[in-house]
């Protein structure tokens, strides 16, 4: 039985063990997948020991994605561009292969929703690790991206770094009301403090709204604010979570699970 785990701190809230257990049942793959609390001082040693004991792979979540990236030997292109990994696979020769499936998870969920269009205008809120993880796949899909971040220099720096891959720019908050977007993605962590970026109502009512965070009945702070401003097309990030997990599972077990029934089951379990 192949051994896997998700590492983070905190980690008790993670849905990943449940998702991967359901993937294993659906595909007939015998796996073990558990949550592991990473130690701020000992994370590298913990991860090395985990693989030394025979584990086949690991998911990495906050705050360890950059540190796990540094431990790998080989990288996918999306992982290299994000400079952070959410997935590690131990190869037969013992080397660690790093991938970042967040971007493909987002792109696949947008496709599931029927939202992607060629050259659509996307506003991404935030310039942290969550944004870095999805920019390369979005630009590969020929999307036009604007990044807004409270620290303008950080957004400008990120836009400059990814400019070689497609159309991307940064914008100050005062510039946003003058623009129009087809899709607005919240990639900030403000929701963890019960806050959100309060965009003008005109932007929220004219675009599809996507929050990378998720909650029962899609009641994240950002989506609740968007609804209060008249937004009618919105979705939380649960589908992205299940989607990225599916591509991780494929990397490990060579079979891509069917996301839809697992997403439906996880959503039902969250709401009851």
Swiss-Prot record:
One of its GO terms (molecular function) is shikimate 3-dehydrogenase (NADP+) activity. It holds the Pfam family SDH_C. The keyword Hydrolase does not apply. The keyword Cytoplasm does not apply. It catalyses: shikimate + NADP(+) = 3-dehydroshikimate + NADPH + H(+). SUPFAM superfamilies: Aminoacid dehydrogenase-like, N-terminal domain, NAD(P)-binding Rossmann-fold domains. Keywords: Amino-acid biosynthesis, Aromatic amino acid biosynthesis, NADP, Oxidoreductase. It comes from the Bacteria. It is an enzyme of class 1 (oxidoreductase). Pathway: Metabolic intermediate biosynthesis; chorismate biosynthesis; chorismate from D-erythrose 4-phosphate and phosphoenolpyruvate: step 4/7. Shikimate binds at residues 14-16, 61, 86, 102, 214. NADP(+) binds at residues 77, 126-130, 149-154, 212, 237. The active site is at residue 65. One of its GO terms (biological process) is amino acid biosynthetic process. CDD domains: NAD_bind_Shikimate_DH (cd01065). Its EC number is 1.1.1.25. GO terms for cellular component: cytosol. Involved in the biosynthesis of the chorismate, which leads to the biosynthesis of aromatic amino acids. Catalyzes the reversible NADPH linked reduction of 3-dehydroshikimate (DHSA) to yield shikimate (SA). Belongs to the shikimate dehydrogenase family. Homodimer. This is Shikimate dehydrogenase (NADP(+)).
